């Protein structure tokens, strides 16, 4: 769906 499926809003930077 997005860049990060787990943390879309966090931009998968450091989730």
From Swiss-Prot:
Similarity comment text for this entry: Belongs to the guanylin family.
Cellular compartments annotated: Secreted
Cleavable signal peptide: none
GO cellular component, one term: extracellular region
Function summary: Endogenous activator of intestinal guanylate cyclase. It stimulates this enzyme through the same receptor binding region as the heat-stable enterotoxins.
Domain of life assignment: Eukaryota
Keyword field: Disulfide bond, Secreted
Disulfide bond residue pairs: 4-12, 7-15
Keyword flag Disulfide bond: yes
UniProt keyword Secreted present: yes
Protein name: Guanylin
Main subcellular location of this protein, as a coarse class: secreted
